[in-house]
Structures are given as C-alpha cells and as structure tokens.
UniProtKB/Swiss-Prot annotation:
Gene Ontology BP, a term: symbiont entry into host cell via disruption of host cell envelope
Domain of life: Viruses
Protein known as: Depolymerase, capsule K64-specific
Record's keyword annotation contains Transport: no
Protein task: Functions as a receptor binding protein (RBP) and probably mediates the attachment to the host capsular exopolysaccharides. Displays a depolymerase activity that specifically degrades the K64-type polysaccharides of Klebsiella pneumoniae capsule.
Coiled coil: none
GO CC terms in record: virion component
Keywords, alphabetical: Degradation of host capsule during virus entry, Degradation of host cell envelope components during virus entry, Host-virus interaction, Viral attachment to host adhesion receptor, Viral attachment to host cell, Virion, Virus entry into host cell
Matching Gene3D superfamilies: 2.10.10.80
Location in or out of the cell: Virion
Length: 996
C-alpha cells in the first residue's frame, strides 16, 4: 500500500476502523469505517459515500442519512466472515505466513506464529503478532521478543537508479544498500566477472573512465528495508519528497523537522547514566541545523568540564540537569551574530573622536555620516578616569544603542576627551526564547556557575530553578547565572531556593544567583531568591536595569550603574539595596523585610538603602521612592549597637582613599537627591526607628549630603523622635570656600529637607562637628503630626543653623538644642510657624542661642492650646510672649476650655520695678483702673504695638465721654498714670497686662 493511500482525499485506500456507529463522529474520508450491530446481533461495517466532510447525528446509519450508494454503504459483516470461514479461508495470522516468507525470502513453512514458551532453533522464524515483526534465534520464546532473538528485515526485489557521468569519472556510489547489482553504461551491460567493475559496499568502480554525459544505469535487488530505510535516505531528500507522503505543499522532508529533542536520540533520562556527550552533540546539531531544542521531562547526569553551547531557541522546561561532583562545565547561550571590537587605531574610533564628545550629548557627531554601527548595541571605553573601584582606577565608559548615524538611545552622563575602544554587538533580527532547565545540586558540583549568557540581544529567558544547594558554598564559583555583553534581555521566573553563605579560604565572600557585566536594557521579572544567604544580584558596568515583582534578598551593584535602576513591586530581604550610581534609582511598591535574628545582627553596611562602601559610598544621581513598606526590625543589630539601622546610608570603607580621581566629572554625592513618596513601617518600635534617616558613618567627609531630601506621606511608627544626622558629610559644594555661616539670613541655603503629611513623634537635626559647620539648611514640615494610638503633636530639635518652617503642623515643642546630645546651636537660625496648632503640655519653645533675643519664632495664624491662663501668670504664657512673634494667633485654655488673652502681669503698681520680657513686635493689652470719679467717664488704653521694657513708653488713650485722644507717659514702675485731656484730669492705676 502506498503512503499516499492515507491521504484524506483518497477514498480507495486502506480502511480505517473508527469503532462503533455513534453520534458526533467527524467523517473526512470514505476510508473511515463505523460498525453497526442490528437487533439480531449482526455487526456490519459502513462506509460514507455522501458529501464530505460529514458528522454523524445518530447511532444508526438508517437514520443518519440512510443506507444507499450515496449515503451509508455496507462493506463487510459478521455473516460475511462466517461465509469465508465455511469456504476454508482463514483470516488469522497464519493465513499471512506464506506471503511473509516470500517477502523475507525465507524457506517455505519455516515461519511460525510467536507463542510464549515455545523452543526455537536456528532454523525457526517467528512472526510476532504484536507488531508484525519477524524474529530468529535459539532459546525459549518469551512474552515479547527480546535477547537472544534478533529481528529479521525483509528483502525487497528490484530498484533502478540512474546518473549522468562527468568527464573522466570512473566511480559512483549508489544511494542504497543491496546484495545484487547490474550496471549499464549507455545501455550496455557491464560484465563484472571479467573485471568490468568492482563493488565495494555501495560504491562501484569501473574499469576505465567515462566521458561527460555518459548514461549510468543500475538495477539492484535484495535491498534490505531497515529502520532508517531508503525512502528516508533518498526519496525524501528530493525537493518533491514531501508530496510523497501527502504533504502537497511541502519541499524537502528535512523542512518538516523544526526541533530536536533528547527523546529523538534515546538519551537516558533517569539520571543514572552520564549523558554529557550525547547532550552536547544535540546542542551542536541544533546549532548546525539552526532549529530549536525542545525537551520537557527527564533527569540528565552531566560531568566534567564540557561547555554546552547553544545559539538557537532552547526549551528545556521540565528537564532536570544533574551535575556530578566533578562538574565544572556550564550551559553557554549565545547568538550567532558575534561582537566586533574596534580599538583606538581603527578608522571607526578615529572617526568618533573627530568630534567633541560632551556631557548630555545623545549623538556621536563623528558618526553623523557613518552607518557602521547602525542597529548595534555598543560598549564604549574612554581615556578619562571616572572613579576608583577597590583600588583600581576605572576610566570613562558608556553602554548604549546606535539607531542611525551616531544617534544614541541614551544621553551621555559625562563627556570624555576621547574613545579608545568600541565593542559592537549586532542586535538580533528575531527574539530568541530560552526556557531554562532545573538544576539539582545534590552532588555538590565543583562549579556553581552553570548558566552563562554571553553576547546576546533580544533574548527572552524563562523559568529554571536551582535546588539542593548547600547553604555554605566553599571555594566555588559563587554565581549561578552570569550575563555578559547583552542588550534588550528579559529574564523571568527563575527560582533559587535560597542564596548561599559563601566561604573562600574560611572567610565570607560574595555569592549571587545572578551576575551581569556590560549590559543595557535588562529586565528581571518574578525572580525568587530569598533567604539567609549573601545576595541575589551583583552587577557592574550596567545601564538601564529593571527588577519587577522579584522576591530577592538583595539588589547589589558593584561598579556604578548608568541610566536607571528600577525596583518595582518587589520583596527585598535583610540586605536591601547596595548600589553605586551614575544615574537615577526608582523604588516603587516594594517591601523590605529587615529581620536579622538569623544573622546575629551582622551587616555589611548600616542602611536599608545603601551606597557601595568599597567604591567610596558616593551616588551621583537621585533616588526616587514611592510606596515602600518596612517589615520587622533589625532587632539584633539594635541590641548589639544600641541603635537602629539607617534608612539611607552613604558610607566609605576607607575615608583616606581618593575614590574620585582629580579631573573626574563625577560628583561625590551620597545620593544627590532623595524623594520618598509613601513609607509605611508595620512594626511599632519603642524609641526611634532609624539611627538616622540619611546617614554617613563616622567623620569621613567623603560624600556630600544630598542637596534635596523630601519625605511625603510617611509613617515611621516609633515612640521617639527620628533623626537626620549631619555628621560625617563632606563640605557642601555650595560652600566650597568654607564661608563661616554666622547667621542663616546672611548666606544662601545649601541643602533642602522637606516633610509633608508625615507621622512621627518628632524630628531631630544633628549638625556636623563645629570645624565642618558650613551648611545652611532649609527645612520645611507640612501637615505633620503623630498618628499612633492617638493623634498628638510633634517635637523638633536642632543645633544646625538653618531656616525652619512649619506649616499646618501640630507642634508640641521647638528647641535649638538637640535632644540626644544636648548640643546647643552655635549659629543664628530662623523659625516660622504658619497655621496649624501648638499644643504643649509645658512650654512650647526653648530658643537658647544668644538668649533667644536674635532668634524669634514667627508664628502666623496659629492656634495655641495648653495651660494658658487669663487669671494667673503661667510659665507657658510668659514662654510664648518671650520667644514667639505672633500675628493673628489665638489662645485656647484647656483649663477653662475657652479662648483667652494670656496674662503676663497682674496686680497693683508699687514703687518696685517689675520686668516682663516680650518679643519685639508682639501686641499687648494693658488694663488701667480709673481712680478719678468723673461721671460717665472710664479710662482704657489702646494696644501698645511694640515691646515693653522699663522706662518711658508712648501710647494713646481715650475717654468714653468725648472720645478725645491725647498723649501720655507710662511708667511701669510708677504708681499712677496721669494725663491732661482737655479740661478734665483723669487718674488711673495699671491692673493687668495681657498678650494679644
């Protein structure tokens, strides 16, 4: 039967058994047979002769289109089989034995049906009914054919093959295996017995040479049909081969093979046999054929130092790779288009350097008329030093993509005097998909770095995992996945059970699930590596990195990144973020779980979000945060160090080193700008939560304090004031001449801090040591209060010179002396309160610099609440009058629950002087009791709109009777107030002075 008989368009081929007649069968060829059993038990097969396709609707052919020549037509029934039996026609396997004997060229009656338990001799041949194969051997037959029996292949009869000779040809190879051959040259039979030709295998050598165009024709017989038969080898290799198996639109049959699998090569998948070479061969074949690999199950044991290179799509999801203990190899994924390196003497680099390269440029102007690098990712190195990394000076570098004639995707952070190397990586025209296998480290392989991606672009990498990894990796490659020279990459869904604690030479070293170098536009999505270990990600010389929905214990950058670093919707562990940057960092909707009990309080650096201390602790860019959550507390660290961790930390291991070389354009900020929009701390803390919100350890003077720090909508959930410690920061570049700031009004602001809609008990600002006090701080608190178990006002302490402004806040206390160190400000500052409330248990102000006279607290449109009194002179009454300069304020007494004018002095005058200190510009109201009896006349004073002191004070008064105004003299230490008003002389005695 020809294979074409199986075509769906052929109705005269082999019958296909589709079982019992039933509803819902889809008929697309008349070869499909359905069997119907009538009420008498007769089983009849029916073939559909109507229009195709057809779907049955009932269980009976008579009601599903009917039985006719144009509908259902019967072909064979049980009665017909019984008739054949009566005629002596046997339809069992035995009936086929003579035919099979002829086909296999076996002796007549030597072939029998395989029957378990039967003894076999060398002259016996057995037909196995299970699959129709023929076997021969000596022994007892089992339930299925097996050793020592061997399968016998049939012998075909005659095949003809032709070819056209070339000039001088005397040899040709017939593309078949055969036993007998007849050779014809130009139609003449050649005589083998007289030396006309010699046969060696499938090669025929002629006795003499042919001329070009001579006709070669052979007739061969007794061709064995093997597992890989001649149709696959020859017929299906022809351009029209696919048509021979019914694929009318196909070409070469090889085109139909669009992937390779391990199963195709019968590779052991139990993990018990070393299959290193077999897998490597499949990788090589896939690279050669440029087709993907797909395998979704099995465990495969590998060993040795083999590097498995693959440059096509590769889907090994579900596969487990089991490296042996001596395994030092790795899977290397790379693209066909490899990079080109242009050195300083190349014409391309010379062309780039022909134009000036400036900071903020997004065009290499030297390439404005050159297309060499179009559509390439480039990695450039320059002549100028940028920074020092662990004692090594690193020169200028930049990663970007050239779209067309020098146009870069990324602007240059810094300019450079000249380029000395360009590595150009062609960007792939297609997206390559990689699905990683699982790696089982149960054997503790000698190398952990089992996955590497080198020189790749537009790769989408999925899945994969590492498990049974020891917590302590001793003297091993500490990186699982390494990515080098890459552009436009997404790595997602990789699962590492936990990061390890690495030990090298007995000391803690680094260990990472993922490491990358020289990359641009790489995204890590849904990666898991969370636990007690060292780290998850270590990167250097990288540009534009994104972490999305990752559950990892640390994000770590070694060399500073450029462009952006985005951490979005992630869950980070105890180590948080450690990064040096020459770009901006964005952290959004991310949690930090800082519980440290398992680590016994050990931290590499103090902060949750840190700069790299081994690179000098600088970060020449901003950090922008939105909606982050701090979970738990570093309680062991707090116990050992008697302080909490910091939120932001810029710290250098060695303050004596110069981490920024002379002439470098890098500015050593400890974060240039910090903007936090949304911070929530879930665990209540007794005391202050952070040692400092922004911190530089010790007095290092290596990095600048951020120019701008802003906290919006933050809840610190602690019971003591939070702190910003200014110790240890380098002298601000805005006062590089070290001008002594004696008065905040006499110098521009150098640094800006702002809190809006924040909840904390209070805030403390600790100034640098006096010899480094060159900052002029501008700090604003807007709508801040403490929202804990109840709403309460906040306290503010500072010894740092600055302009401090509080708008719509609830304030308890303001002091120019720090709470934690009792350090008094040594410079003049200013304090302004706009709106809001001042609600104090005791006095609200303690301004001690220069006795407070030169540092007024300007209070506008504010409500004062507290133990204010109009009937007695209280300390809070006097404190507000002395330190605050008031405008449109009101006083509410929580003693009698009413608005009042606080009393500053009550009583009667005497010859003794009474001293009252009132801030210049405050309004006071003096009440005078009339001592002269004049009918219809009472005496009152107007508000005295200036400060009160012992001595003469000018003012005015009026009498109710006439409204006449006159001048008077007031002596607060005199007995009477006297004045001449027209013709009436009035006398009065001061009985009270009140703050308005």
């Amino acid at each position: 039967m020809s294979l074409s008989n199986l075509s769906s368009s052929n109705s005269n081929g082999a019958f296909l058994d589709y079982g019992e007649f039933r509803s819902g069968v889809y008929i697309q060829t008349s070869n499909q047979i359905l069997y119907f059993t009538d009420e008498n038990g007769n089983k009849v097969g029916y073939q559909w002769k109507g229009l195709l396709p057809h779907t049955t609707t009932t269980n009976d052919p008579s009601t599903d289109g009917g039985i006719s020549d144009t509908a259902w037509c019967s072909i064979v029934g049980s009665g017909f089989i019984e008739k054949l039996s009566k005629e002596g026609i046997d339809l069992s396997w035995k009936a086929h034995l003579p035919t099979v004997e002829v086909s296999y060229n076996l002796p007549h009656k030597s072939l029998k049906i395989w029957e378990e338990g039967t003894n076999s001799t060398d002259n016996d041949y057995w037909l196995y009914p299970g699959d129709g194969t023929v076997w021969n051997g000596i022994g007892v037959l089992g339930d299925i054919p097996d050793a020592p029996f061997k399968q016998i292949v049939p012998q075909n009869n005659v095949i003809e093959w032709s070819a056209i000779a070339t000039e001088g040809q005397n040899q040709f190879t017939v593309p078949y295996e055969f036993t007998n051959i007849s050779v014809f040259i130009n139609g003449l039979l050649q005589n083998k017995s007289t030396g006309g030709y010699v046969v060696n295998g499938s090669t025929v050598t002629l006795n003499g040479s042919l001329k070009a165009g001579d006709d070669i024709h052979v007739v061969i017989s007794n061709i064995p049909i093997k597992n890989i038969n001649y149709i696959t080898d020859v017929e299906l290799s022809q351009p029209d081969a696919a048509q021979k198996i019914g694929l009318l639109h196909g070409g070469n049959i090889q085109n139909l093979q669009n992937f390779l699998s391990f199963d195709m090569f019968n590779i052991d998948k139990t993990g018990s046999t070393d299959v290193t070479s077999q897998i490597n061969n499949i990788f090589s074949l896939a690279n050669q054929l440029n087709i993907p690999i797909k395998q979704h199950d099995g465990t495969y044991l590998v060993s040795g130092s083999t590097i498995f290179t693959i440059n096509t799509d590769c889907d090994l999801s579900g596969v487990t790779i089991l490296p042996s203990s001596n395994f030092t190899g790795y899977f290397l994924y790379t693209q066909n288009e490899q990079p080109t390196t242009y050195n300083s003497s190349s014409s391309l680099v010379t062309l780039i350097n022909s134009a000036t390269i400036n900071a903020n440029d997004s065009i290499l102007y030297g390439l404005i008329n050159d297309t060499t690098l179009d559509g390439n990712a480039i990695f450039m190195k320059g002549n100028d030093p940028l920074y020092v990394a662990r004692g090594t000076t690193k020169n200028w570098w930049c990663n970007t993509r050239i779209s067309n004639r020098g146009k870069m995707d990324d602007y240059l952070k810094y300019g450079v005097s000249g380029i000395n190397e360009v590595i150009s990586l062609p960007i792939s025209k297609k997206v390559t998909t990689i699905k990683l296998p699982n790696w089982d480290f149960i054997n503790q392989p000698a190398n952990n770095g089992v996955i590497r991606f080198n020189n790749i672009s537009r790769y989408r990498i999925h899945g994969g995992s590492v498990f049974n990894r020891p917590l302590n990796d001793i003297n091993k490659d500490p990186v699982i996945i390494s990515i080098n020279y890459a552009y436009d990459i997404i790595l997602q869904d990789f699962y590492d059970e936990y990061p390890s604690w690495p030990l090298v030479g007995g000391s803690i070293a680094y260990a990472y699930t993922i490491n990358f170098n020289y990359i641009n536009r790489v995204t890590f999505k849904d990666i898991n590596s969370q636990g007690y270990g060292w780290g998850i990600v270590g990167g250097q010389l990288a540009t534009n990195i994104t972490y999305l929905r990752c559950n990892i214990n640390r994000v770590d950058m070694h060399d500073p990144f450029m462009g952006y670093l985005k951490i979005l919707d992630c869950d980070l562990g105890y180590y948080g973020v450690s990064a040096t940057g020459m770009g901006d960092m964005y952290i959004e909707r991310t949690t930090f779980n800082i519980d440290d009990l398992a680590f016994n309080g050990w931290r590499e650096v103090d902060g949750i979000i840190n700069t790299r201390p081994d690179f000098g602790g600088w970060f020449d860019g901003g950090v922008y945060i939105k909606d982050i959550t701090i979970i738990g507390d570093a309680s062991k660290f707090r116990e050992i160090n008697n302080r909490g961790v910091s939120l932001f930390s810029a710290y250098s291991y060695n303050a004596t080193l110069s981490y920024i070389p002379n002439g470098s354009p890098v500015e050593p900020w400890g974060f240039k700008e910090i903007i936090v929009n949304g911070l929530r701390c879930t665990k209540p803390i007794t005391g202050k939560r952070f040692s400092s919100l922004v911190y530089a350890a010790s007095v290092q003077n290596v990095d600048y304090f951020p120019r701008h720090v802003k906290f919006n909508n933050c809840d610190f959930n602690s019971s003591d004031v939070e702190c910003i410690d200014l110790h240890g920061w380098k002298i601000t570049p805005d006062n590089s001449s070290k001008t002594s700031i004696s008065n905040t009004m006499n110098f521009k602001s150098t640094n800006f801090i702002e809190f809006t809609d924040c909840s904390f008990v209070g805030l403390e600002i600790l100034r640098p040591y006096s010899s480094y006090d060159y900052m002029n701080l501008e700090l604003k608190l807007n709508n801040c209060k403490y929202i804990g178990s109840n709403i309460s006002p906040i306290s503010f302490y500072t010894d740092q010179v600055g302009n401090y402004e509080f708008t719509n806040c609830d304030i308890n206390f303001i002091s120019d002396t720090t709470k934690s160190t009792s350090s008094l400000s040594n410079r003049q500052s200013s304090f302004v309160i706009n709106g809001g409330q001042i609600n104090s248990v005791s006095v609200p102000f303690s301004i001690l610099y220069n006795s407070g006279y030169s540092t007024p607290v300007l209070v506008n449109n504010t409500i004062f609440k507290g133990s204010f009194s109009q009937s007695s002179v209280t300390s809070i009454n006097l404190n507000v009058a002395e330190f605050a300069q008031l405008s449109n304020c009101r006083f509410y007494s929580n003693v009698n629950n009413s608005y009042i004018s606080p009393a500053l002095w009550l009583g009667s005058t005497s010859n003794s002087a009474t001293s009252i200190t009132v801030m210049r510009g405050n309004k006071i109201n003096t009440v005078i009791t009339n001592t002269t009896t004049v009918s219809g006349i009472s005496i009152k004073t107007d508000i005295i709109p200036f400060g009160v002191a012992s001595g003469h004070i000018n003012g005015s008064f009026y009498v109710d009777a006439t409204g006449t105004t006159g001048t008077y003299q007031l002596y607060l230490n005199s007995l009477n107030l006297k004045s001449q008003i027209g013709k009436i002389v009035s006398n009065g005695t001061i009985s009270g002075i009140y703050l308005q």
